[in-house]
């Protein structure tokens, strides 16, 4: 069995990669994918600590986070589609107007 420290390290690596993706990318869709990667990093950490503590609370939190992530992705993609229809672009640096 793989020690839980490896899962925690993997979770940290995924979190850092997701954070770098949010900071570096200029495309809104890539930023949304990076945010989802960070949420999945939290899920891996919860499951790793759940393995160590022999409790099911971590797995319950994972189900809640997956539900929230699905709702966030649906709302985010809907907003991105609306922005694309208005501006014909999804580049963050070109979306500086607050006018409706």
From Swiss-Prot:
Main location: membrane
Record's keyword annotation contains tRNA processing: no
Subcellular location: Cell inner membrane
Annotated membrane topology: Multi-pass membrane protein
Sequence intervals crossing the membrane: 4-24, 28-48, 60-80
One function term, GO molecular function aspect: NADH:ubiquinone reductase (non-electrogenic) activity
Biological processes annotated in GO: ATP synthesis coupled electron transport
GO cellular component: NADH dehydrogenase complex; plasma membrane
EC numbers, comma separated: 7.1.1.-
UniProt xrefs under PANTHER family: NADH-UBIQUINONE OXIDOREDUCTASE CHAIN 4L, NADH-UBIQUINONE OXIDOREDUCTASE SUBUNIT ND4L
Protein name: NADH-quinone oxidoreductase subunit K
